[in-house]
Amino acid sequence: MDKKQQAFQFVDQHREEMVGLWREVVMLESGPHEKTGIDAVAARFGQVLAEAGAGIRSVEFEHAGNMLIAELGAERKKPGVIFLGHMDTAIAAGAATERPFVIRDGKVYGPGVLDMKGGIVAFLYAIKALNAAGYDSRPIKVLLAGDEEVLHAKSTAPDQLVAESQGYAAAFNAETGFLDNGIVVGRKGVARFTMEVSGVAAHAGNDPEN
């Protein structure tokens, strides 16, 4: 059995365990202003990654969900791969009680099952599957922000993401894809800039030379 088959076999053998973790984190309230719940999700994901052999770091924020950083195989020589995601949801407090995690007709429902706790659980188990298959080619880093839904308004997470990504070969985002199981290779983004301009104030039709 080759390494790819071993990895898929691991996933098949741990399917119920994956769903259990998915259920557990969905039932943790982690809406945009629920720092306690977001930090609880971070702690649980950190526990799973530590059990997989990753080194764990936490960037703590006073008024935003903490950021989780995990590294596996830092000694490997090739440029690494990043798994990127966020642990907060866009859903108000109380949703986990009102609309708890449920599987109905082969589909999973609940607050944050797609955006994006399900995606994070999937790549945590991808990492565990790679371990089980003996993968040792590239370092792997996991970067999980705690306040994406509020545009990191009260944290320095964007700066952390940029700094932690330097020198890596590729990044995979746990955001939801399309129903055809295709891979999304690009999305629109937003950047904000502050510009300072010096010169003489003038209308283009009045003294344009100056």
Language model feature labels by segment:
Residues K107-V121, H203:
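Glycine/serine-rich anion-binding loops at beta->alpha junctions
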Residues V185, G205-N210:
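Acidic-enriched catalytic cores of C-N bond-cleaving enzymes acting on peptides and small amides
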Residues D2-P111, N131-Y135:
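Acidic/His- and Gly-rich active-site-bordering loop/insert found
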Residues G80-I82, V108, A169-N173, R192-T194:
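Short glycine-aspartate micro-motif
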Residues L72, G85-M87, D105, A145-D147, ...:
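Fold-independent oxyanion-binding glycine-rich loops
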Residues I69, K141, R192-E196:
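Beta-strand secondary-structure signal
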Residues M116-K188:
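Acidic/histidine-rich catalytic neighborhood of metal-dependent amide-processing enzymes
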